[in-house]
C-alpha cells in the first residue's frame, strides 16, 4: 500500500467512524410500564416476567438496548394502582401492561389516553374495557382469560374429583367488577351437573376465616384475585382444616397444599402480551388489534392433599393433569 493510498484509507476511516457512532446513537429506546397487583415477587411472577422478556427479545426488543421496562408493584389498593399508572404516564411510557381486571381498570383510569395492554382480563367486554374482542375500539387491547370456559371447567373438574358433591361455595372479592360474569359462567355449568353454588363474597382479609367456614360440608372454588393470592397459604390451611376440597385459578395454591388448580397458561398470556407491545410500539392502534383468547390450559393436582382429604382422584382425571404433586 503506497503512501497516497494509506492517507486516503485513513481519511475514509475517520469519516466512517462518526457515521457509525451516530448510527449507534440513533437507536430509539422505548420505555414501557408494567403494573402488577401485588407487593411481593412470587416464584410464578419470575416465570411470567421471563416469558414476557423472552417474547419481547424474540421480536427484537432487548432491555438496555432499545427497551426499558418500568415495573410498579401496586398491591391490591385500586387508588394506589391509579396513582402508579399516572406516575408511569408522566415518565413518560409508551404504554402500560396491566395484569388482571382491577389493575387494568386502574391503568385505564389513572393514565387516560395511554395504550394499555391487558394481561388475563376476566371479562373485557363486560367490564367495558373493549367494545368487542374483534374490534376493541379504544386504548385497551390484550389477552382475555377465556373466563367462561375456564370457570365452567373448574366446576366440572371439582365434580369429577368429588363425585358425591352436591354443593360448592364460590369465594370472591366483592371489589372485583367481573364477579357477576364469573359467577354466572360457573352457575351455568353447575346446573348441568346438578350442583348448587353459593356465592361467598369477602371485602377484606379478616373475613376469610368465616367465609371459608361457610363452605364446610361441600367444596370451594376460589376465583382468581390478588388479595386471595397474597393470602394463599392461609386460605389453603383453612380449606384443609375445614376438610373442604378446593380448586383454584393459580398453581401457587396447589404448591402451598391446595387440592387442584385449573387455568389458562400464564406463560401464554405473558408471551402473547409481548406481541401486543411489539405492534403498538411499531405504530398500531390498540383499537384495531383484536383481543386474543388462550388455547392452552393447565391442570395441577396435589395427591398428598387428596390423601389428606380422603379423596381418591379418578384415573381419568390423573391422565388429564399437566402436573402431579406426590
Residue ranges, per PLM feature:
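Short hydrophobic alpha-helices and adjacent helix-cap/hinge residues
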Residues: 1-326
